[in-house]
A protein has these predicted regions:
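N-terminal loops that bind phosphate or other acidic moieties
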Residues: 2-352
Length: 352
């Protein structure tokens, strides 16, 4: 589907299934609200899937790999050649998210949506829009047409996952320089100062961080992206990986597949998606708060409370994978626990 068709296909959650899930929680033999945010997430999953007892056993990670021309400004500790190396590791099932996914029975689909050099792996899906973005310090990151194309590739990935029968998705990314692009996107969408939303990424020095902030400030002043137009923001200061994730989240909502969000880059893409279609936020589950400074601001903008605050900032979808593990743990008692009636005990009642 096109972006417009996808947005028009997104419908509200199933209130009947959510009510049934809340009633089940009220009757199984545990304290009211005992599973906290995980309990809320299970109710949300019920509404997305239309299942009072949600089945998320078929799960996949879609990881978008892309390079960013702004790396030329010295905003990263390592060179962009690392993107291709890690993408090829994903093709071999050897990256961090692949090894975590293996423990969760989760399939991983790495996608080359814009790596600077061709990827030497048949296991990496080839959907390259261009060989890395332009340096947004001097020119727009990509054309508006390329931004839209990348979003629609993400939609296509969600449709592929629906056809394969997956009932839960996580989105990941790999791209040197993408904490710079995500900070620029966050600043553009919310008007927050670059210094507030920009972090050290993969270990920048203080001098490097100051340079990174200055580059983002200058790019925003140069391009003036429209905060009310997600495609314009992507076109001017975004990344192809972020665009792909944005499309994945919209496509998953249209297919009624829940998505577990990862860290700051994932949440920047999620905010772009929500600006395009506010209803899509209801299909997103927040896994963790990243160690990047923009993370809590993005989660607040999305109205999300994450399960985990573990200081993670690895990317690839690893924080989302950790969130899936917690969902599995919470679903076990939800599915199998006896009710208060079964054990002859009066159910807990809400107290004023």
């Amino acid at each position: 589907m096109t972006l417009e068709q996808t947005i028009s296909a997104i419908r509200p959650l199933d209130e009947k299934s959510m009510t049934a899930a809340r009633n089940r929680f009220a009757n199984i033999a545990m304290p009211l609200g005992g599973l906290g945010l995980l309990q809320d997430a299970i109710v949300q999953l019920a509404g997305i899937l239309g299942q009072p007892v949600p089945d998320i056993s078929r799960r996949a990670a879609v990881v978008f790999c892309a390079d960013n021309g702004v790396v030329a400004e010295g905003v990263t500790q390592c060179g962009q050649e690392v993107t291709a190396t890690v993408a090829e590791n994903m093709g071999r099932g050897e990256s961090t998210v692949c090894l975590m996914a293996k423990q969760l029975g989760m399939d991983v689909f790495p996608v080359d949506i814009g790596v600077a050099r061709p990827i030497k792996s048949e296991k990496v899906l080839q959907f390259s829009v261009r060989r890395g973005t332009a340096n947004f310090a001097h020119e727009p990151a990509m054309t508006r047409k390329e931004a839209l194309e990348a979003v629609e590739i993400g939609i296509k990935m969600a449709e592929m996952c629906a056809e394969k029968g997956y009932s839960l998705l996580i989105g990941g990314e790999m791209g040197i320089g993408n904490t710079t692009t995500s900070a620029a996107v966050m600043a553009a969408l919310t008007g927050t100062e670059a210094a507030v939303v920009t972090g050290r990424g993969a270990g920048l020095s203080t001098a490097g961080l100051e340079r990174k902030i200055a580059v983002i400030e200058a790019a925003l002043a140069l391009h003036r992206p429209d905060p009310n137009d997600s495609i314009d923001v992507l076109h001017k200061v975004g990344g192809l990986d972020i665009a792909g994730l944005c499309g994945l989240y919209l496509g998953a909502a249209a297919q009624r597949i829940p998505v577990v969000l990862d860290g700051v880059i994932s949440c920047a893409a999620a905010l772009l998606a929500v600006r395009l279609c506010p209803q899509s936020v209801h299909f997103m589950v927040a896994a963790h708060r990243s160690d990047e400074p923009a993370s809590i601001l993005l989660l607040d903008a999305l109205g999300k409370r994450p399960f985990l605050t573990a200081g993670m900032h690895l990317g690839e979808g690893t924080g989302a994978a950790a969130g899936v593990a917690l969902l599995d743990l919470a679903l076990a008692p939800y599915r199998e626990m006896v009710s208060f009636a079964d054990i002859g005990m009066e159910a807990y009642q809400p107290q004023k």
